[in-house]
Amino acid sequence: VAVIPGFQGLTSDDRITTLGRGGSDTSAVAVAAAVKADRCDIYTDVDGVYTTDPRIVPRARKLAKVTYEEMLELASVGAKVLQTRSVGLAMKENVRVQVLSSFDDPTENPITGTLIVGDDEIGEDEMERQLITGIAHDKNEAKVTLTRVPDRPGAVANIFGPLAEANINVDMIIQNIAHDTGSTDVTFTVPGAELARTIDTLEKGKDAIGYQELMHDTKVSKISVVGVGMRSHAGVASTMFKALAQRGINIQAISTSEIKVSVLIDEDETELAVRVLHTAYGLDAEDAA
């Protein structure tokens, strides 16, 4: 048995460095790819990937299999099981990853976790039946609004260009144009940890952007539903919006990808929204504890 240290690597100029958050998982996947292992088992503090956080929804179900793409989306929008880099590497190198619990005793119970695989191992029939795979939430969001930005070519580039140069990741974007004033309000979200740098960058560029006021709100949360099944099914977003509206939960922003729909809501309504959507998409386990 080879024991190999993880969480470290070399920079482009051959200096030893650490890999940052999720570095151990990334190391494990990289080694598995290098030795062409059949599977990479990652032991962590949870026993698999669930349809959502079981602490919020006790009826959440553990998933037997998840596609790379779904796991990548779930990890990027708040699921804490694996970091995006390890999942992305597994997807690139086609390494099957199994998430297992460090606390399970294999001599007493059969080892059961979640297997992260390619679409070909899931099967079209299974993907058709399973519209939504999981629901994730992320409270580490900040909403920024710039009011009365001149409605002219290049105005948006003056906002997001400097943010990109500062390596600040922008997620949801909304632009509301007031035709009678020739100006627009631009709202977007950034990671909460990047809010201070975002404000500093925008204040330095105020003259170039031409906005009137900068407002921000950290009491927001992003809720995301993820599933490869939505590629072939209509009405996923409609179900989400209707379920939230019926419980009086207001949507502040929306973003979508091929297999994901995300909404921004008040932070205080996070747990309620997750529970409502988990039920709306039929994800509740039948044998609830």
Which functions belong to the PLM regions below?
Residues 1-289:
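C-terminal catalytic "cap/lid" subdomain
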